[in-house]
């Protein structure tokens, strides 16, 4: 079973550790370099502790960290970052976590993937397509990023 646990400020270091894995995965799609320390530049998480519309969640499976999600709530709600540890791939955990997020923030959603990240595009098309019964809009921006838009309030899981 997948659980979303809101990240507390005192757990910021744990989230930053997971973000290192996330950024590493992104180096396949974008030119991201390590810093002299041997780490990737950390994310600025301060706004997550002060801004009411920014939300960070650990994705947990049976008490074990399986990933994280970062959301900006509003109109539309936006998946800012979403990561599942590779050992949890293809077990439905990402889909379950995404559906829980859609339910937590009912309304319009926008989900974007970078140009070369075909695995993410395929994942989100499948998840959103299944969730909405195929009733979503997909477009591409000037950077060839794919963007899916839909309203989760219309398809809330009972």
Feature map (PLM): residue ranges:
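Conserved GNAT-fold acetyl-CoA-binding loop/helix
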Residues: 23-45
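A short helix-loop-beta-strand connector motif used in the catalytic cores of GNAT acetyltransferases and
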Residues: 44-57
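Active-site beta-strand termini and strand-to-loop segments that position acidic
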Residues: 60-62, 150-153
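Conserved beta-strand in the GNAT
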Residues: 58, 64-72, 78, 83
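Conserved beta-strand-loop-alpha-helix junction that forms the acyl-donor binding cleft
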Residues: 110-125, 129, 139-143, 147-151
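Short secondary-structure junctions
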Residues: 4, 131-139
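Conserved acetyl-CoA-binding loop-helix of GNAT-fold acetyltransferases
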Residues: 84, 90-103
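A short beta-loop-alpha structural element at the N-terminal edge
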Residues: 2-17
């Amino acid at each position: 079973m997948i659980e979303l646990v809101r990240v507390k400020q005192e757990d910021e270091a744990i989230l930053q550790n997971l973000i290192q894995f996330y950024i590493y995965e992104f180096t396949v799609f974008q030119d991201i370099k390590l810093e002299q320390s041997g780490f990737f530049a950390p994310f600025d998480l301060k706004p997550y502790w002060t801004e009411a519309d920014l939300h960070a969640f650990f994705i947990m499976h049976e008490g074990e960290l399986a990933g994280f999600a970062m959301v900006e709530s509003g109109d539309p709600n936006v998946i800012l970052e979403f990561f599942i540890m590779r050992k949890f791939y293809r077990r439905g955990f990402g889909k379950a976590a995404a559906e829980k997020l859609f339910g937590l923030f009912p309304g319009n959603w926008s989900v974007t993937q970078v140009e070369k990240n075909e695995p993410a595009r395929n994942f989100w098309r499948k998840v959103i397509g299944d969730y909405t019964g195929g009733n979503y809009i997909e477009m591409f921006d000037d950077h060839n990023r794919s963007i899916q838009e839909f309203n989760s309030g219309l398809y809330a899981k009972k």
